[in-house]
């Protein structure tokens, strides 16, 4: 669990697939963490356990962590634009999920990143659904953020 955000799962692993083929067992484990150091530590534990038990382990793909930053100018601007557009405070939520933001954060460590999107429920299930009106709000918010950034860039020039 996160020591920074109450209730947030920080690191987890999931045995998603277990197959048998003759005398060969294959397991597919998904590791996930918002902290890259914890992800690497968990992967190392799997290597140690597999070595102790004469099990071959292969890494097929990796998804980098995206650690929450307490200070974010972009998040502050987002909250201000959200307040101006919708007349209420933006809901800020950290989630335990693999997001593409981690890929960008690993490639450009100082990049200030936020993730926004429409309201989606029952993700990755047969009942998954999305609020169409929230898609419209997200679009309006994105346009307003880009317009504000364009204005700020013009003032800096």
Descriptions of predicted regions:
Residues 10-12, 16-26, 85-146:
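Zn-dependent metallopeptidase/amidohydrolase metal-coordination segment
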Residues 36-42:
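Short, conserved charged micro-motifs
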Residues 43-61:
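FAD-dependent oxidoreductase catalytic-site/capping-region signature
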Residues 1-12, 46-52:
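Acidic-enriched catalytic cores of C-N bond-cleaving enzymes acting on peptides and small amides
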Residues 14-18, 26-36, 55-75, 102:
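A short beta-alpha structural unit
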Residues 32, 44-49, 107, 130-133:
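Short, solvent-exposed amphipathic alpha-helical segments in soluble enzyme
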Residues 147-157:
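Generic C-terminal helix-cap and adjacent flexible tail
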Residues 1, 68-84:
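Short, low-order "capping/linker" segments at domain edges
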């Amino acid at each position: 669990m996160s020591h920074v955000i109450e209730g947030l799962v920080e690191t987890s692993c999931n045995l998603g697939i277990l197959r048998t083929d003759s005398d060969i067992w294959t397991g597919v484990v998904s590791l996930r963490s918002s902290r890259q150091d914890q992800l690497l530590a968990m992967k190392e534990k799997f290597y140690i356990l597999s070595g102790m038990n004469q099990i071959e382990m292969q890494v097929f793909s990796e998804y980098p962590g995206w650690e929450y930053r307490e200070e974010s100018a972009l998040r502050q601007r987002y909250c201000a634009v959200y307040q101006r557009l919708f007349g209420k405070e933006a809901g800020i939520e950290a989630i335990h999920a693999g997001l593409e933001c981690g890929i960008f954060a690993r490639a450009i460590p100082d990049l200030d990143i936020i993730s926004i999107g429409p309201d989606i429920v029952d993700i990755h299930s047969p009942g998954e659904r999305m609020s169409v009106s929230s898609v419209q709000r997200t679009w309006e918010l994105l346009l307003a953020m880009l317009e504000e950034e364009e204005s700020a860039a013009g003032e800096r020039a």
